[in-house]
Each structure stands twice: as structure tokens, then as C-alpha cells.
Amino acid sequence: MNKQNIYWQLYQDDPILKPGFPSPVLADPSFLFPENCPDGHWHLFAHNIFGVQEFLSEDGIHWKKRKTVVWNAMRPFIFLEEGTYYLYYEKYKFLHVLMSWFPYRKWKSHIEVRTSKDLKSWSSPKTVITPKFPFHKDSKYGESVSNPCLVKFGEKYRMYFSSSLVFIPDCGFCEPKHITVAEASSPLGPFSYFSDPILSPNEMDPFCNLGAGSIKVIEWKGRYLGFQNGIFWNPVRKESCSAILFLQSEDGINFERINHTPILGPTGRGWKASHVYACDVKYSEKEKIFILYFNARNKAHWTQGKEAIGLFVGKVEESKTSGTKSTKQIKKPKQTIKKKISQAKPKVKKSKRK
């Protein structure tokens, strides 16, 4: 059997999308390839402090804001099936995201979905996930379900989502504590909840000892790949961090790490100095390239930090031997990212999958 080596590299050092005034953050991107959109453009959804924004691009690099799709919402995920677009997001009360930065304000959220046939007009919202189990809630910080990710499993649909909260002192706000699953026979639900998390923080885990963060899962070559941003304390830097961990699973429930260390983490300086957060990932079978949009933070505390969106690329190479580290540049994908992708930042992180 052939072995797949995945060579990960940043598209560029700088972000491709920055927050616009007055919001200090633009976060949690989810995107569609142009061939899957009626207008032939790339579409990307992300949130600022006011709600979920939609952006358009001709090349996947240069983006323009189209509109605010949902107010008082965050952490979107876009899913397409048979001509219908499903936009999932975490919904909260008016201005609650701003008030949550102050002490003694409990959080409360649920996950909604809206549908569209043309990415222009959207249906009324439908609630699909609410906090039900004890591990969805925290007596001190509130009730939270967030970071939806829908994957089709045969005739069923599996919703991965984050639940509950853990306070991160140097950030001054909470992050998701667990990751869990619900299943349904329709993208609109009703969903049956798993009674336990599938991923939780572990004090012995150097890259996930504070919170499980979020996960995006995709099916690839008969297995399921997971991209988790674990929340952890860095004892060397004496601060919290977040980094993207690369996982795999046979059943989509029991995950193991492909790489023992993160494939993408904070740099200690620049726009992604402190935290690399949630991402969205899609794979081009024709070009053998993973495209991963992520958001990152420059400073921990909410009064100082800003978040922007970057691009990470994984090129797949197959070999029948162990091989050596690739030095090849990524070639230009058709109908995806234009010529600069072949000039991606040369630093490479290698992943192996047998």
C-alpha cells in the first residue's frame, strides 16, 4: 500500500484577511470552493464581534466583504449538499459576546442553521443543538455549544461541536472545554446527542491541557482526518497557547494524532504570536492539495489582542518507500488559488499516513 506524505506550509507570513474597524477580531473561517458556488467565486464566512460576515474572492487570496449574514452569531460552518447550502453557527443574545468579557457574566448559546439555494437569500433560523448534558455546562461560566462541523456518514449526518467552558486567565475570557458529537438523519435534525465527550483536556497532554478547543473533520481515503486546535499552558513562555493538531480516525469517534506535535502553532511574535485557533479544511482530489484557512491571535488578553485569518497548505505525495523530505514547490491548482501558491513559504511540516 502506498504511503501518503503531507507537506504543510504557510501560504505567506501575513494574514490574508484582517478585522475591520471597530472589531478587533475576525475569526473561525469556513469556506467554499468556487466550483461549488453559483457565481463561480470563493465564499468565506467568519465572525467579528457583531456577527457572521460573508466574503468573496476570485482567487482565494484577495477578499472583499459582501455582507453580514447573521447578527449576534459566531463560529460559522458552511455545508453543501444537493444544491442546498446549510450555514451553521453559534447563536447568542444581543451584545452578549461583549458582556462576556466582564466578570460574573454567564454565557449561554445554542447552534442554529439557515439554508439557501443561491448564497444570497437565507431561510429563517432553526435551532439544532442546545446545551443538555452536564458536560455542555459549567456552573460558574455558563452553558455553551459551539464550533459546529457537519459530516455525512453513510445515510446519517454527524455534528461535531464544542461544549462547556474553561476560563483562560491570561486571555481574560473562556474557551471551549470539550468536543462531542450528535447524529441525525437530516442536516436539519433532530439530532441525538452522544452522552460523553470524544475529546477533553488532559493535564498530562502538553498541547491540550486547558481545553479541547474545536475540531473540523473531513473524510479522506477511507479514514477521517481531524484538525483540532488544542488549548494549553506553555510552561516555557508562561502563557496560554493554542495550536492545530492533526488527527486521524477509522470511525470518526476515536482519534489519534498523526503528528505528535502541532502542524501549526503560535510563533511568539507577529500576528499569530500567542494563539492559532479554529480552522476549516477542504481537499482538492485533482490537485492533491489541502487548503486550510485559520485564525490566529497576536496577544493573549482581550484588551490587547487582535485576530486575523491566514492560509495553510498541505501537498500530498505518495510513495512506496519511506522517501525523504520534499523540496518541491506546490504547483498552481486549477480554479483554486492563483500563482502565488507556487511561491508558498518554504518552511515545511511533514505528516505521514500509512
Predicted regions and their residues:
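Intrinsically disordered, Lys/Arg-rich low-complexity segments
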Residues: 325-354
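Extracellular glycan/ECM-engagement signal in secreted proteins
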Residues: 279
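Beta-rich carbohydrate-recognition and catalytic domains
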Residues: 1-146, 151-209, 218-274, 284-331
